């Protein structure tokens, strides 16, 4: 059945997404308006509202039927609110609540209606009068959704090596502590897990108990359905936050992998340095072998070689000393200001003549600079050792966290399996929300255009009326000026008359004078009467204009208040749309970041594969070099054995590192393959579901259009029937009144048989009286049956 909208009541549910609004709510209103009865703002449970009495009173006064509203539940208590908060507690890594499956969508005989503007919040003052059947079905479906919402899929960052067919499934009531914040405290995470499990079990029991109560009790009011939808939206918000946490966790895992890669690269560099040292040792051994092979070696040559070697060592030592001194001097120069030319000229530095001073030759004089340099090197060594210890502790903590993660995943595997339908349904709902948002934005734009047009028309009317007022005021002022001028003319005429009287006293006779005076008096009286009549007319016009002005001012104030209310509603809707747009943009950015991180991980893997290939090539070359060296090392057995032992150890280490790198690469390849397969499957399923939902929406829209057309046809037919019945009723009454008047004029005293006839005619009149309310009741029953067939 179609949802009609209530108005002038502020909604309590301000957190439900407006995208759940169906297309039926956007349909045009019926031709005959239905006004609901007045309601008290705070109804008490001891004094229920008599909606039936209010409906009867409204029908008797207006002659129109009214849909009787549902009885509202009393406000929730603190215990109910606490139960709802417990029910809405969801553990991390839960993707979406379990909604209906596609089979249930196809097999359902009736689709439940979505919430109206009363449940959607937004601060819009609109109510919805839902019928009993729709509210019952809506409450049952919502309880089913909440009951199934206990099961949810999990995205696991540290996944074990499992075949794609053997995918792990998780349960929603498994404990998930804060892995990012409390990574070091593994022992303290057991107690909150117990409490979270108890809360979830308690919420599940509450849900089951309320389900049983729903079957026992009569269907709930729209407030219960609104509360359920509010809880559902809170669950979806929590799950969006959990998705954000998952992205953060994946980012940290990628960082850990990058750290491991850098550590592997450092280890490879160390191995390369060690190999270079081994090559140098081998070269020295070759040189010693060549020297031993030479037969004509004299002790003088050996002494010369020793001296040359000593000189080389001394030269290298002096170079190192010069380097250290340069470093220390550069630091000193950066710390202190350089000397000016005048100051440097007064300083007695190197002597121009004579031998070199001893402090330039002897190393003892340079000891303070060397000591300072060595102190700085020791400080750096201490810092490096401290950082190494911190890295070791950090590695231990990371290993503990990984162990905890694996233990938790093992516990999750022991739980019951869950389907993967929640994530699909959430994304389809998000797409539907976007479509509904677009439709609502278009409607808002249309309403804004209509409001602007009405405002402009109102302003034009006001401007016209003000112009008329200005013109009338100008007319009144002109007439007042004319009156003043006429009075002045009268005064001048009176003065002239007096002068003429004075002049004509001696000339004119008394009879002539009296006749002239009488004529003048009659003229004056006529003029005064005309002036008084004109003044009365002008005063009446002024009063009428003042009344019109007051009424126009009242209308202007009412229109201004309406415009303000409409502007406030528009601002609220704009703010809500901005909020949801910002949330959508943030989620898009997070998805783009996750995709970028995946691409960087792919690049890292490619680099690792290249490094592994280079390592294998170097290993082959090293093996070849080792074989060559073994063939050349028969002379000096002890040194060759030591070198072979070192090479064996290094090869074992290299093999161990290579095995570790190969294992890690295999794990990463396996995880990436699983993720790609999951993403491909999910994308295909999402596309199928989107197509299915589009088909369902088109079918429902067609059904709604047909039902609206039938409703309009029925209303037109009912109006025609009502008009015809009213005409017949009037005609019958006029005929009966005419016959009664004729009989009363013919016979003043009627016999008993005429009385009987009159009584029978009156009974017939009463029996055949046709009431307008009966026809309207029939119309309402027809509308209700039509609405139920549509639902």
Curated annotation (Swiss-Prot):
Bias (Polar residues) ranges: 94-107
Disulfide bonds: none
Compositional bias per record (Pro residues), positions renumbered to this chain: 30-45
InterPro entries: CEP89
Recorded superkingdom: Eukaryota
PTM annotation (Phosphoserine): residues: 50
Subcellular location: Cytoplasm, Cytosol; Cytoplasm, Cytoskeleton, Microtubule organizing center, Centrosome; Cytoplasm, Cytoskeleton, Spindle pole; Cytoplasm, Cytoskeleton, Microtubule organizing center, Centrosome, Centriole
Biased composition (Low complexity): 50-62, 181-190
Function noted in UniProt: Required for ciliogenesis. Also plays a role in mitochondrial metabolism where it may modulate complex IV activity.
Protein's recorded name: Centrosomal protein of 89 kDa
Organism, as annotated: Mus musculus
Gene symbol of the encoding locus: Cep89
């Amino acid at each position: 059945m179609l949802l009609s909208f209530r108005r002038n009541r502020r909604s309590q549910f301000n957190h439900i997404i407006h995208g759940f609004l169906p297309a039926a709510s956007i349909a045009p209103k019926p031709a005959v308006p239905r006004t609901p009865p007045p309601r008290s703002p705070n109804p008490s449970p001891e004094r229920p509202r008599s909606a039936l009495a209010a409906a009867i009173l409204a029908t008797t006064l207006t002659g129109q039927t009214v849909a009787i509203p549902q009885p509202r539940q009393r406000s929730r208590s603190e215990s109910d609110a606490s139960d709802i908060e417990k029910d809405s507690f969801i553990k991390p890594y839960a993707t979406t609540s379990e909604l209906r499956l596609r089979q249930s969508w196809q097999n359902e005989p009736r689709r439940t209606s979505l919430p109206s503007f009363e449940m959607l919040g937004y601060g819009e003052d609109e109510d919805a009068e839902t019928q009993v059947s729709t509210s019952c079905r809506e409450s049952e479906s919502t309880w089913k959704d909440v009951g199934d919402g206990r099961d949810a899929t999990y995205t696991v960052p540290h996944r074990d090596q499992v075949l794609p067919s053997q995918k792990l499934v998780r349960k929603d009531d498994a404990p998930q502590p804060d892995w990012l914040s409390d990574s070091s405290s593994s022992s303290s995470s057991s107690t909150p897990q117990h409490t979270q499990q108890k809360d979830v079990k308690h919420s599940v029991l509450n849900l089951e108990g309320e389900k049983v109560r729903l079957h026992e009790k009569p269907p709930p009011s729209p407030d219960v359905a609104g509360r359920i939808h509010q809880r559902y939206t809170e669950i979806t918000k929590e799950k969006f936050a959990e998705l954000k946490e998952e992205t953060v966790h994946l980012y940290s895992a990628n960082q850990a992998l990058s750290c491991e890669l850098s550590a592997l690269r450092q280890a490879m560099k160390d191995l390369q340095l060690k190999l270079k040292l081994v090559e140098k040792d081998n070269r020295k051994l070759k040189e010693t072998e060549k020297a031993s092979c030479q037969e004509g070696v004299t002790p003088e040559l050996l002494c010369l070689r020793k001296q040359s070697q000593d000189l080389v060592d001394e030269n290298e030592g002096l170079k190192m000393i010069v380097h250290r001194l340069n470093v220390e001097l550069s630091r000193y120069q950066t710390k202190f200001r350089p000397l000016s030319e005048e100051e440097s000229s007064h300083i007695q530095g190197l002597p121009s003549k004579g031998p070199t001073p001893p402090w330039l030759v002897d190393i003892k004089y340079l000891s303070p600079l060397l000591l300072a340099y060595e102190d700085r090197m020791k400080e750096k060594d201490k810092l490096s050792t401290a950082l190494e210890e911190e890295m070791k502790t950090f590695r231990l903590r990371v290993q503990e966290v990984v162990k905890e993660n694996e233990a938790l995943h093992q516990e999750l595997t022991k739980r019951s399996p869950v389907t993967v339908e929640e994530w699909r349904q959430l994304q389809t709902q998000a797409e539907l929300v976007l479509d509904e948002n677009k439709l609502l934005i278009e409607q808002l734009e249309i309403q804004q255009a209509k409001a602007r047009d009405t405002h402009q028309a109102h302003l034009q009317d006001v401007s016209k009326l003000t112009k008329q007022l200005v013109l009338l005021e100008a007319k009144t002022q002109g007439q007042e000026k004319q009156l003043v001028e006429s009075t002045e003319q009268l005064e001048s005429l009176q003065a002239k008359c007096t002068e003429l009287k004075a002049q004509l006293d001696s000339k004119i006779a008394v009879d002539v004078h009296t006749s002239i005076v009488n004529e003048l008096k009659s003229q004056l009286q006529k003029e005064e009467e005309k002036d008084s009549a004109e003044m009365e007319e002008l005063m009446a016009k002024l009063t009428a204009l003042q009344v019109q002005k007051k009424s126009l001012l009242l209308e202007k104030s009412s229109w201004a208040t309406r415009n303000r209310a409409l502007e406030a509603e528009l601002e609220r809707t704009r703010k809500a749309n901005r909020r949801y747009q910002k949330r959508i943009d943030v989620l898009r950015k997070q998805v783009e970041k996750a995709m970028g991180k995946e691409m960087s991980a792919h690049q890292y893997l490619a680099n690792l594969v290249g490094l592994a290939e280079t390592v294998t090539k170097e290993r082959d070359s090293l093996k070849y070099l080792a074989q060559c060296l073994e063939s050349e090392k028969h002379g000096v057995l002890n040194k060759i054995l030591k070198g072979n032992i070192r090479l064996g150890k290094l090869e074992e280490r290299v093999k161990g590192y290579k095995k570790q790198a190969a294992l890690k690469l295999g794990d990463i390849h396996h995880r990436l393959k699983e993720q790609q397969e999951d993403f491909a499957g999910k994308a295909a399923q999402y596309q199928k579901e989107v197509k299915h939902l589009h088909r369902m929406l088109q079918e429902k829209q067609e059904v709604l259009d047909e039902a609206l057309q039938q409703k309009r046809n029925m209303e037109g037919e009912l109006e025609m029937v009502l008009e015809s019945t009213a005409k017949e009723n009037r005609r019958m009454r006029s005929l009966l009144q005419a016959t009664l008047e004729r009989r009363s004029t013919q016979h003043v005293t009627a016999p008993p048989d005429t009385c009987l006839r009159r009584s029978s005619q009156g009974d017939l009149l009463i029996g055949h009286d046709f009431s307008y309310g009966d026809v309207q009741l029939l119309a309402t029953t027809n509308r209700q049956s039509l609405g139920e067939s549509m639902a």
